[in-house]
From Swiss-Prot:
Keyword annotations: Ligase
InterPro entries with a match to the protein in the record: AMP-bd_C, AMP-bd_C_sf, AMP-binding_CS, AMP-dep_synth/lig_dom, ANL_N_sf, CaiC
UniProt KW Iron keyword: no
Pfam families for this protein: AMP-binding, AMP-binding_C
Stated role: Catalyzes the transfer of CoA to carnitine, generating the initial carnitinyl-CoA needed for the CaiB reaction cycle. Also has activity toward crotonobetaine and gamma-butyrobetaine.
Family statement: Belongs to the ATP-dependent AMP-binding enzyme family.
Reaction(s) this enzyme catalyzes, per UniProt: 4-(trimethylamino)butanoate + ATP + CoA = 4-(trimethylamino)butanoyl-CoA + AMP + diphosphate; crotonobetaine + ATP + CoA = crotonobetainyl-CoA + AMP + diphosphate; (R)-carnitine + ATP + CoA = (R)-carnitinyl-CoA + AMP + diphosphate
Lineage: Bacteria, Pseudomonadati, Pseudomonadota, Gammaproteobacteria, Enterobacterales
UniProt pathway annotation: Amine and polyamine metabolism; carnitine metabolism
Protein name (Swiss-Prot/TrEMBL): Crotonobetaine/carnitine--CoA ligase
């Protein structure tokens, strides 16, 4: 079943501008309180100007352009401007540091970067130290450094016409984005996302929360994440609704933003719910228009009930990952919800629980959650330049192995049991244990290292490092945490350190992580 009808993203935006015209499409609020608003017509014009900017800088169909930005209008302009000319967006997690960002640049083959002044010094260092393919950097800030190969995004964009100058042939099978996501291996993998994937995500996610053109969808989720892009932005735009993008989450400001913009739909992760609950109660807690709060794992029933009662909302559970593009299992609009179930499989998908031999399990038995979709359409196409990793998780007939465990009941409701192997869920970020262990192992005093996730009342899981030192060495907590802060993103830095004489291992020599939790 083809619900896209051959419509790529360029056609989508041209149609949206024609149909919705002066209706508000996008509202962006910065951390400083600056608000920018764009109608569908204005937003399409900004997207066209941005596409023309990239064309003048030599970007053509198939070229990769990296974005290292916080939530801002420029992210939206670039995302769809690149898509209009057949180029490929490579969003970089705005919290990553030098080594991690450089690795993504190198492995994505990005030739141009759009970033802001706060991240520019890091990329100066990367260009000096690493052999990347970067030809040019665009800065979104007004003030520019006196460096060659750097230009002002805003100045260049404003010089461009509002109609598209370069319109190569496009197909819905063309790649629109490569989104690097942490996995169970030591390095992130590039998830290849097509025009069809994004168009489908818009229709599917709009269906999931019954979006209409009079809705206002507010999110504080980072734009470089799949949930902001495919659950929120694509859904809102596909429905002709208004999309509100807040630069950064603030527990103190969030409810006021929901009220100010008269949001009808928003999304929350457990860390947000917990920090909202510790804010002082207010008589305005239920003074809002929210009808759905999209929710992602993992919350106790007591926490859920307390949140819903205090704020007068209901949670719409959704389960998915970058590779599934959308929440392929979830609550359905208008249907009964069965907590703590993660819901039922959505349209265009199949879901099974399978055993270690890849055989389907009956209701009530725990196994791996597996999803069947169409690669490049309803699930990701492949891992970029990594056929071995693709083959490991994606079968030829479209069955995707999530690596997560769960079970289903007799009525088709699914239940999540545990996270995928060696992953830590920390405040909405997926952190690979192996990646951290490889970084920490480079410390000259450390002989052996393992990191595990331990329960945290606010951020789902905290990171604890267990280390064995080289003989005769001593290591202070201050020295250890300073080393981590210098070599990894802040959200990956362990919260706890324990120095041990040895680590528990099985007969194969593998560390038994569960003995350390």
């Amino acid at each position: 079943m083809d619900i896209i009808g051959g419509q790529h993203l360029r056609q989508m935006w041209d149609d949206l501008a024609d149909v919705y015209g002066h209706k508000t499409a996008l509202i962006c609020e910065s951390s400083g309180g600056v608000v920018n608003r764009y109608s569908y017509l204005e937003l399409n014009q900004e997207i066209n100007r941005t596409a023309n900017l990239f064309y003048t800088l030599g970007i053509r169909k198939g070229d990769k352009v990296a974005l290292h930005l916080d939530n801002c209008p420029e992210f939206i302009f670039c995302w769809f401007g690149l898509a209009k000319i057949g180029a490929i967006m490579v969003p970089i997690n705005a919290r990553l540091l030098c080594e991690e960002s450089a690795w993504i640049l190198q492995n994505s083959q990005a030739c141009l970067l759009v970033t802001s002044a706060q991240f520019y010094p890091m990329y100066q260092q990367i260009q000096q130290e690493d052999a990347t393919q970067l030809r040019h950097i665009c800065l979104t800030d007004v003030a520019l450094p006196a460096d060659d190969g750097v230009s002002s995004f805003t100045q260049l964009k404003n010089q461009q016409p509002a109609t598209l100058c370069y319109a190569p042939p496009l197909s819905t099978d063309d790649t629109a984005e490569i989104l690097f996501t942490s996995g169970t291996t030591s390095r992130p993998k590039g998830v290849v996302i097509t025009h069809y994937n994004l168009r489908f995500a818009g229709y599917y996610s709009a269906w999931q929360c019954a979006l209409r053109d009079d809705d206002v969808y507010l999110t504080v989720m980072p734009a470089f994440h799949i949930d902001c892009q495919c659950t929120a932005a694509m859904a809102a735009f596909s429905a002709g609704a208004t999309f509100v993008l807040v630069e950064k989450y603030s527990a103190r400001a969030f409810w006021g933003q929901v009220q100010k913009y008269r949001a009808t739909v928003t999304e929350c992760i457990p860390m947000m719910i917990r920090t909202l609950m510790v804010q002082p109660p207010s008589a305005n807690d239920q003074q809002h228009r929210l009808r759905e709060v999209m929710f992602y794992l993992n919350l106790s029933e007591q926490e859920k009930d307390a949140f819903c009662e205090r704020f007068g909302v209901r949670l719409l559970t959704s389960y998915g990952m970058t590779e599934t593009i959308v929440g392929i299992i979830g609550d359905r609009p208008g249907d009964k919800r069965r907590w703590p179930s993660i819901g039922r499989v959505g349209f265009c998908y199949e879901a099974e629980i399978r055993d270690d031999h890849n055989r389907p399990l009956p209701a009530g038995e725990i196994g791996e959650i597996c999803i069947k979709g169409i690669p490049g359409k309803t699930i990701f196409k492949e891992y970029f330049l990594n056929p071995q990793a693709t083959a490991k998780v994606l079968e030829a007939d479209g069955w995707l192995h999530t690596g997560d465990t769960g079970y289903r009941d007799e009525e088709g409701f699914f239940y999540f049991v545990d996270r995928r192997c060696n992953m830590i869920k920390r405040g909405g970020e997926n952190v690979s244990c192996v990646e951290l262990e490889n970084i920490i192992a480079a410390h000259p005093k450390i002989q052996d290292i393992v990191v595990v996730g331990i329960k945290d009342s606010i951020r789902d899981e905290a990171i604890k490092a267990f280390v064995v030192l080289n003989e005769g060495e001593t290591l202070s907590e201050e020295e250890f945490f300073r080393f981590c802060e210098q070599n990894m993103a802040k959200f990956k830095v362990p919260s706890y350190l324990e120095i041990r004489k040895d680590l528990p291992r099985n007969c194969s020599g593998k560390i038994i992580r569960k003995n350390l939790k």
